[in-house]
Amino acid sequence: VGGLENNEIFLKNVRQAMETGEPGFSFNFGAKQNETLRNACTEVTSEDDSDVCNLGSANLGNIRSLDEFRSVVHLGSKFLVCGTLRADLPYEKVYKVREKNRRLGLGLMGIHEWLLQRQLPYEVNEELTKWLEIYENESEKAANEHCDRFYISRPVAYRAIAPTGSIGILAGYVVACSVQ
């Protein structure tokens, strides 16, 4: 295990962040150690200050069938809902805004790889459209049913553009190829 100096992935990401600004790390020390709350990401925007979003990504490059994809989206959406119940937050106001909005951001990554596996051009096509319909419908259905089960507010948002630089780089997938 060891310290951060032994973590190759972390060091690779830090080097790239220093060179390009991606992935979007937030280091809160030194002059920034007293920062209260910041949102370095812009995948999901909100009119509410103090809003939070629980982000995650489904990796299309590793999914082989529509049934498997439906299951991944279903479980991923439920997982993100549970994250809104368990995450510790820094301020009471953030808890209140989270309860009001329960903002989720299930993204898709590996779209480029998915297209290459199927020898499809990088454009919207009939097969991709079917997958995106499942993504839209199942993410909302699963999240709403799970929220209703716990008698909590339904999310105001379900999906986000992904992968972010951070998630894509960590997973070793192409970043900034998002079809939404």
Feature locations, PLM:
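Function-dense linear segments that define catalytic or interfacial modules
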Residues: 16-118
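Internal maturation/activation junctions in enzymes
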Residues: 75-95, 99, 110, 115-164, ...
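Gly/Pro-rich active-site capping loops and adjacent beta-alpha segments
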Residues: 38-39, 168-170, 174-180
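Short acidic-glycine loop/turn motifs at beta-strand connectors
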Residues: 29-33, 62, 162-164, 171-175
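Coil-to-beta-strand transition motifs
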Residues: 22, 164-167
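Conserved, charged catalytic cores of large soluble enzymes
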Residues: 1-31, 105-144
